């Protein structure tokens, strides 16, 4: 016989709250959060839906870890240190206890890796697909949060890691493309389990003028920066950093560049800064590739130049939530 809601909380989720006093062992109506003097609370929330944000063939522990990581990426973009989270899950009727046990083990693994703690939440049954939401809390020194609105004329635009891996990884998982076997494995892993750039975020507080995580696509998320900062951007296509697998795919078909620039789920950081040598030092310190891809310019458009200096246009700037 499956456990009831309260038995599931006691068995699978209460252990995740044991090390955080303010969680009150998940036995009160709400949790307690205290801020040190001189620190601000950063709050973000994300929802993932089966069949939309994850395919459904993933193991429950991977689903749990992706749920946390997409919001951890938001904290990273603002330079915040993870603190705690709440969890809301709507699961189909009849979801077995062993699914929840594996799901909670994934949460436990990433709590240990990223120093974050469960402090509350809710669970319900649904006749539809699984809907999973997490609200994350982080902290930053007062006035040090990196926002989208600080970019100014002449700033250099940088991006961490490589772009396009996750969107092609989704295509691999759906068997829509068939790349090299090793490329397939790497690209699919980038889609299924993103790596939030928390260490980079902490370093960017000293260097970046504006930042955003790349969840909806490079062009869309850079567009969020330019809109908030009331400026434009000029990007050089040949400077966009690609993994070897994505490079082979775009070399086979140059139309795939649109997917690189507008596909989401990379969870890298796009940011602006004035001091390129400072950013290079951060890259060396973290052993993380950080690439200059363009500059902030006047106007409001995000323009892309190809290798011949010609302007490129795309039908969509990135993923839009309906």
Task: Annotate each language-model stretch with its function.
Residues 182-224:
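Polyanion-binding loop/helix "lid" in catalytic or ligand-binding cores
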Residues 29, 155-156, 266-269:
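Short, surface-exposed beta-edge/turn micro-motifs
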Residues 169-184:
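Short, compositionally biased
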Residues 60-84, 105-113, 199, 203, ...:
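Small-aliphatic-rich amphipathic alpha-helix that forms the alpha element of a beta-alpha
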Residues 37-41, 48, 82-172, 295:
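Glycine-rich anion-binding loops of enzyme active sites
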Residues 1-62, 78, 87, 115:
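Extreme N-terminal cap/leader segments of soluble proteins
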Residues 2-15, 39, 93-117, 125-132, ...:
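Glycine-/charge-enriched secondary-structure boundary and capping motifs
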Residues 32, 71, 79, 118, ...:
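Residue-level signal for inorganic ion chemistry
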């Amino acid at each position: 016989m499956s456990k009831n809601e309260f038995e599931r909380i006691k068995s699978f989720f209460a252990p995740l709250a044991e090390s955080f006093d303010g969680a009150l062992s998940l036995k009160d109506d709400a949790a307690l959060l205290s801020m040190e003097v001189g620190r601000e609370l950063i709050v973000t929330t994300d929802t993932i839906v089966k069949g939309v944000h994850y395919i459904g063939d993933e193991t429950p522990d991977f689903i749990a870890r992706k749920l946390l990581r997409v919001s951890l990426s938001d904290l990273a973009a603002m330079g915040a240190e993870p603190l705690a989270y709440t969890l809301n899950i709507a699961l189909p009727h009849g979801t077995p206890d062993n699914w929840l046990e594996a799901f909670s083990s994934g949460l436990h693994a990433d709590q240990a890796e990223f120093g974050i703690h469960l402090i509350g939440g809710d669970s319900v049954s649904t006749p539809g697909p699984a809907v999973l939401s997490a609200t994350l809390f982080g902290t930053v020194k007062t006035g040090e949060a990196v926002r989208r609105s600080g970019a100014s004329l002449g700033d250099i635009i940088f991006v961490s890691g490589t772009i396009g891996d996750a969107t092609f990884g989704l295509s691999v998982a759906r068997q829509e493309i068939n790349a090299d076997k090793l490329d397939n494995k790497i690209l699919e892993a980038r889609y299924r389990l993103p790596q939030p750039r928390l260490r980079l975020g902490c370093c960017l507080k000293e260097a970046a003028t504006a930042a955003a995580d790349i969840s909806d696509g490079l062009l869309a998320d850079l567009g969020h920066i330019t809109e908030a900062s009331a400026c434009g951007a000029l990007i050089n296509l040949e400077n966009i950093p690609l993994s070897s697998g994505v490079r082979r795919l775009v070399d086979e078909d140059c139309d795939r560049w649109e997917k690189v620039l507008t596909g989401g789920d990379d969870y890298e950081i796009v940011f602006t800064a004035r001091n390129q040598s400072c950013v290079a030092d951060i890259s060396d310190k973290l052993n993380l590739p950080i690439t200059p891809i363009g500059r902030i310019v006047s106007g409001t458009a995000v323009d892309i130049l190809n290798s011949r200096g010609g302007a490129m246009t795309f039908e969509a700037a990135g993923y839009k939530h309906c």
